[in-house]
Amino acid sequence: MKAISPVRSMSSCYQAVCCLSEQSLSIARGSSHKGPGVDEPMGLLYDMNGCYSKLKELVPGIPQGSKLSQVEILQHVIDYIFDLQIVLGEDQQQNSILNLQKSDFSELATQGDASVCH
């Protein structure tokens, strides 16, 4: 699975993240701040199904038209996170190599200036 995301509008991604954030906050707050009907098992199941639907929309590589189990959706999410970690690790490694090369160049330039001046 590649870590390349299909083109999505910024507003739809922002709305999805806000929706997930609100649901996460309501779960973290506990039962005293939950809305009506959320304490019931069916309400919780409905919320979880909504979360899985959002994951299917947001994670690239999940076939949109197919019926996947929750475990399959989570496996796609885990694979996508792993792919992102690899890409970020490669970017950090390239940045450190470039910074090292840049510092070597500046040291050489400084040494060259010193020999010309003295």
Curated annotation (Swiss-Prot):
Subcellular location: Nucleus
Pfam families: HLH
Cellular compartments per GO CC: cytoplasm; nucleus
Alphabetically ordered keywords of this record: Biological rhythms, Developmental protein, Nucleus, Repressor, Transcription, Transcription regulation
GO MF: bHLH transcription factor binding; protein dimerization activity
GO biological process: one example: rhythmic process
KW Transcription (keyword) present: yes
Transmembrane annotation, as ranges: none
Domain bHLH: 32-84
Domain of life of the organism encoding this protein: Eukaryota
InterPro entries: bHLH_dom, DNA-bd_prot-inh, HLH_DNA-bd_sf
Main location: nucleus
Its biological purpose: Transcriptional regulator (lacking a basic DNA binding domain) which negatively regulates the basic helix-loop-helix (bHLH) transcription factors by forming heterodimers and inhibiting their DNA binding and transcriptional activity. Influences cell fate decisions in the embryo by sequestering and blocking the activity of the bHLH transcription factors that control these decisions. Inhibits the binding of myogenic bHLH-containing complexes to E-box DNA, thereby preventing activation of muscle-specific target genes. Also inhibits the activity of neurogenic factor neurod1/neuroD.
Binding partners and assembly: Homodimer. Heterodimer with other HLH proteins. Interacts (via HLH domain) with the bHLH protein hes4/hairy2 (via Orange domain). Interacts with stat3.
Name under which the protein is recorded: DNA-binding protein inhibitor ID-3
Organism per entry: Xenopus tropicalis
Upper taxonomic lineage: Eukaryota, Metazoa, Chordata, Craniata, Vertebrata
